[in-house]
Structures are given as C-alpha cells and as structure tokens.
Amino acid sequence: MFLVTVLSTDLAAKCHHYGDESEDFQLTCWLKCGDWRLALRPPGVELSDSVATDILVSYKRATEAVQRSSSSSYRAFHSWALMNFRLAEQISGNEKIRAGTSMANKSPTVINTHVIVAVKGFVQAISVGTKRWSASVQQDMLNLLSCLFKYGELQNVSTTINDGMDSIEMEAWLGVLPQLLARIHIKSQAIRSVLHSLLIRLGTKHPQALMYPLSVLLKSPVVERKVAAESLMNSLKAHSNALVEEALMVSSELIRVAILWLELWHEGLEDASRLYYGEGNVSGMLDVLIPLHAQLEKGASTRREQEFLKSFGRDLLDAHNHIKDYVRLITDSGQIIPTQGGFMSPNQAVRSGSPANAEAEAALNQAWDLYYTVFRRINKQLPGLTTLELNQCSPALFNARNLELGVPGSYRVDGSYIKIQRFIADVHVITSKQRPRKIAIRGNDGKDYVFLLKGHEDLRQDERVMQLFGLVNALLARDRRTNTHDLSIQRYAIAPLSHNAGVVGWVPHCDTLHCLIRDYREANQIPLNAENREMLALAPNYDSLTVMQKVELFTESLERTRGKGNDLYEVLWIKSTNRYVRMLVHFHDNFSFDFITFNYFTCPVRNGWSGGQISLDHLP
C-alpha cells in the first residue's frame, strides 16, 4: 500500500513536470493517480474525507486536462462523475442512519453540490461516449437517471439535468427507455416535468420506439401510471395518430389471441376456487370473477367468443345472478363480505343460525355448482386447442394490411425498422402448461418473422434482463481479454403487451432439453417417465418420505433405468462437434439448446434463475 501511495505521489509530480510538454500524458497521469488511490479502498468501504478529497482532486485535474488536451477522454468525465455520485450516496446513507428523516433534511448543501457535479460529469461523459459508441454509456445513463430519481427534488438538480439534455443525443435515451417509462407516474412534480418533457421529445423523433411500451402502461392496474401514459399517448397522437391507433389495435388483439375466453375463465375459476375454498376469501374471489362477468356482458367480438357464449353463457349468467344475490343479501344484513373464513358447506350454512347467512351461502354454493360444471367442460376442451385460425379469434389482425407499425424488436437506433405487412393466418398452440402461441408476421421486406406469443406471464422483467445482457455483451466485446473467446450471451426480442402477455422473438434451430431427452428415449425405446415408474414401484408412499429418503430412492431408480440417467449427456455428446460436453450445474427442462452454436438459453429468462420468486400457487 505504501509503495502504491509513493508511486501515485510521484506520478502526480510528473504531471506537473510534463504539463507544458504533453497534455495527453498529464491527463493519463491524473487518471492513474485517482484510480490507484481508489483501488486502495476495497469496494463497499467508506471513504474518509482526506482520501475522497485526494481522489476528487486527481479526477478534477484530469477533466481540466481534457480541455487543454487534443483528445476527448470519456474516462476523465466518467470517473469524475462516478466519484461525486458515490460520495453523494455515501453522505446520504450516513445521514439516513443518524437522523432517520426525509431526504430533504440530509446535508442538503453537500449532497446537492456532489449531485450537480455528478450530473454535469455524466452528461459530458455520455456526450463524448455516444460519439465513440462507448460500451459504458448505458451505465452512465442509468447513473444519471439515479441522480434524477433519488435527488431530483434537491435544489437545481432537476434543472441541471434538464439543461444537460440538449448535450445528449436522443438516441442515447433509447437504451434506458424501460427505466424512463417505469417512473412516468412519479409523485415529484419537478422530476415528472423533466421526465415527461424528455419522453415527448423522444416520441417526436422516435415514435415507433414508444408504441409497444406505452400500450403496456395504458393497461396498467395502477391508475396514476395509466393516466400518465394516456397523457403521453395523446401527445403522440398530435403527429402520429394513425401509428398510435395501429399500435393500440395490434396490442389489444394480440392479447385477445394470447388468452382466449376459454383460457381466461379456466385461469379465473382456478384462482377464485383457491381463494374461496382454500383461504375463505370471498372478497378476493369476487375481485377475480366480477371483471370476467363484466367482460361477458360487453358481448362477443369474434367467432371464438360467440362459440364460448353459446356453450357457457347460460350457466355463467345464472352463476352471476347467484353471485349478485349473495352480495345483496350480505349487504342488506349489514355485514361485510369476508376476506377469510368465508367458505361454509351447505350444512354449516343451515346451522349458522342466521336466515340471511344461510340464504347467502346457499346462493354462493349454487353459483359454485355452476362454476364447477363450466370448469370441468373447459378442462376437457383445452387439450384439443392445438391450432387457431386468426379470422376466428381476431378478425382485426387477420384483415390488417400494410401497417405503419413496425415488427416487434425491429426498430433500430438510426430510425430504421421493418413495417408489418400482414399477420399469417395460422396460429400454432404449443401444448405446454401456459399454451403459448407460435405466430408469424410478414414484414414489408417480404420475410416472415416468427414470435412466441405468451399469455398468463409478465415479460417486463425479461425485457430488463435482455437489456442487461446487451450491456454485458458490449463490455465483453470491448475488453481485449474476452472479445476473442465468443463469450456473448444469446439475446432475442421481447416486447411486453400488458402485465400478463407479450411476444418473444423465436430463436431458430433450437429445442428444449426436455425434447432432446424425449427424442433420445423414443429412439432407444426407453419410457419417458422410467424413473418415476421405478420410484413408485419401490415406494408407493413416496409423498410421505423424508427428503433424504427421496434422494436415495431417486438415486436407486436411476441405477435401475437403462442408461442410468445419462440420457442428456449421451445426446449432447452425439450432437457435439468436438465430442466435448460441458454441463451446467443448475438447469431445468425449459432450457433450450441451439444446434448451430451449441449454446444454452431459457425463455422466459427469469424461469431459470428466480426460484425464490416463484409463487407456490402456480407450482404443479
């Protein structure tokens, strides 16, 4: 540590010595001096005032050297801004611990100074980095947004950011568009003003980039977010009205194709049944069922919906009437609809002692008799849902021709994109748990673009992960230690349509690991569920075993299965170009395998790595 300190001091002295002869060398020296001093403090360790001052002085002189130098150093402004931002975070964190008060009372002068300097530094770095297409620009954009969202209410911070926007190319903001739109309903008027002004300017120059994301926000259950999105969409209508109308139509119709009424009611009845019978939450049950009934009352718009009403409309109408009777009886008796302990069997309702309670529970039981009948009939029909005709489930998409709207994921920073010519009429339903659709869109370039249309899932998190992967790929490509090792992460287009639907770009030449094992076993005449058969034969009471007993049982069943559970290894060894197989420590059967590049990936991404976030209600 002492040696590094001496070297950094000597280097600083050389900066003065070479100052008149080489400004470029002086710039490099001050940057190294700051980097070395910062490297002496491990990440996460608080910087003392003296150390922070020394580092700031080094980076400050580096930025001053840039103005006298012939080179435009991105790193000087980046390091200077990042250091000030780190100190602002450190001071505000300490003040929170000491005082526990609001941000407005936390050393406002010191924090304000560091944040404003950081904002100016990030703006300069982004301006220089954008021109050089630096891979770190997106990091600076995110840090700049952090300054706005965390400290935008401090004096002059939002004004400084607003003034600096003219120095940043509009295209740079496209990389952080999801972060911008996620905060459009922020309460602070100062921050919201900056944000909305930026988005309006961005929409004027790049309206295509905002179409799909804004259509998602228009369907948000959060009222403030929906209102803010409507305001932005209205500003876009002033110059791109036809485009806005097309985007709204395509988004809503794709959701209609992704989740048919048949599936909507299947999922709704399943959730309502769990709330009522499992938790006794009648209020939650009604929150699920009433919107579904309200949708039916609006009438059918497609042939598929007409067939649904013809098959189930009468029973669902009767069930809805029983639900209304229940609500009326409970309300008239002055009671509150229960959120727990609300389920009563018919015998319990009779013994409850209250005629109103007994009558209300009887109405609810009658409704559930009808719901159960509908659910069983839907359950029988769903396995036969393998193909869809677009003219039956969405005539609007079937008839759409030569749209101004771009194919999802085709928009580029330079403003180029592929317009939608038409939607291919045949839609294939993949027979997995959520029954996603395989759809194709023909672009105005004559090519067909294939997508996976997913319902019942929120793809906004996956969109953020793809954004992260793009940044990682850029950093890997920039570093000379990694750019020759083909370490890039496979990415694909993701366009959320609402909080429970979206489209995912189709990656060709791929199959899931489950399909690889299935095909291998079929070719070798091994039952697909061979291990399961062996386990049940050895221990019919499998569910009552301890965890270790289950592990031992599974190990024994693998030993008794032909191939001893090495099916995946065998099939990958056969397909490998160099007979070398490197396995993942953790994977599941939704992982896909690319036959051309021999890469793994998963869709959606969060399925592979967010096990702690999976809701137990949706586990098999």
Report each predicted region and the residues it spans:
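Regulatory N- and C-terminal appendages and interdomain linkers associated
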Residues: 62-65, 72-472, 476-490, 499
